[in-house]
Amino acid sequence: MVMMAVLMADTGMTVLLAQGIANASGPVFPLVSPFIGLLGAFMSGSNTNSNVMFGLLQVETARALEIGPVTIASIQSIGASVGSTMAPTKVLVAAAVVGLAGQEDQIFRKVTIAVLALVALTGIEAMILVTLFENWTR
């Protein structure tokens, strides 16, 4: 994953994708940002890997929208932290540890509802932060 992220950064793919996301999302990007973090953590099972995969994308999108890159990077990491709890590998291990092997689907459903709610709240908070404290978040 690190090599893929480096390749994308060095070839300009990340900047190109960031410009596309900035054009598509516009001022609501802070609302979308934690969901990108969640996606990376869900795919990789790790906050760190999500940040490696999507951190630069988030920062470049923030720069394109003239939003503070540190603010957006923080929001990415929050989304990834919360999202990693619903990674299939973590649900599988947790079910096995507490003696609920075979019930992963039920656990996943319950965890998904909570995670999506928390990430949505994070996005709403991010929108409020960026909107109200626009000059502080740059």
Please state what every model-predicted region is.
Residues 26-27, 57, 61, 112-118:
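Small-residue-enriched core segments of transmembrane alpha-helices in multipass membrane transport
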Residues 12-27, 56-57, 65:
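Membrane-interface interhelical connector segments
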Residues 1-4, 60, 64, 117-120:
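Small-residue-rich segments of transmembrane alpha-helices in multi-pass membrane proteins
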Residues 1-8, 24-57:
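Hydrophobic alpha-helical transmembrane segments of multi-pass integral membrane proteins
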Residues 5-18, 43-46, 125-137:
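Transmembrane helix-loop junctions in multi-pass membrane proteins
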Residues 28-42, 65-89:
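Alpha-helical transmembrane segments of multi-pass membrane proteins
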Residues 81-138:
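Juxtamembrane and boundary regions of transmembrane helices in multi-pass small-molecule transporters
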Residues 43-75, 104:
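Hydrophobic transmembrane alpha-helices that form the pore/transport pathway of multi-pass ion
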